[in-house]
Design a protein with these regions (language model features):
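N-terminal first-folded block
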Residues: 2-51, 121
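Membrane-interface junctions
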Residues: 42, 61-64
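Extended, low-polarity transmembrane helix blocks
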Residues: 1-20, 64-128
Length: 128
């Protein structure tokens, strides 16, 4: 029971953080537009990342696809962390690093979830 509860907490945290940012991406919030303009990816990148985060969040909650949603989350958050470290800076528009911290939090949750569900990956483990 403790493992299931811990897994649910990780799934919930990763998904809820990614889902709550969708509003800003899909409504073209000025902060979101600023970030993706700085990266040279506005508007295609903003909308594409939003769709990717939506799909990853949904897959994380389906037990058979948690591994794939986690893998997608790792990829998306690697991009976000890399953008913060190499182009944007940790603090963007005086957010005190909250976007960076959320990206790192989702990355850690997804990494642990991927490890916990590694036996569900069909091309790594054959099921009898």
């Amino acid at each position: 029971m403790k493992i299931i509860t811990f897994r649910f907490i990780l799934e919930f945290l990763a998904a809820i953080i990614m889902l709550q940012t969708l509003y800003f991406k899909f409504t073209a919030h000025p902060d979101s537009v600023f970030i993706f303009t700085q990266l040279g990816l506005e508007p295609i990148g903003r909308i594409g990342v939003g769709i990717g985060e939506l799909i990853a969040s949904l897959l994380i909650f389906i037990p058979r696809t948690t591994w794939f949603g986690s893998l997608m989350g790792l990829g998306l958050m690697s991009g976000a962390i890399g953008a913060h470290l190499f182009k944007l800076g940790i603090e963007v528009n005086e957010d005190h690093g909250s976007l960076f911290l959320m990206a790192v939090s989702v990355f850690v949750c997804c990494a642990i979830l991927l490890w916990m569900t590694r036996k569900d990956i069909p091309f790594l483990y054959k099921k009898a």
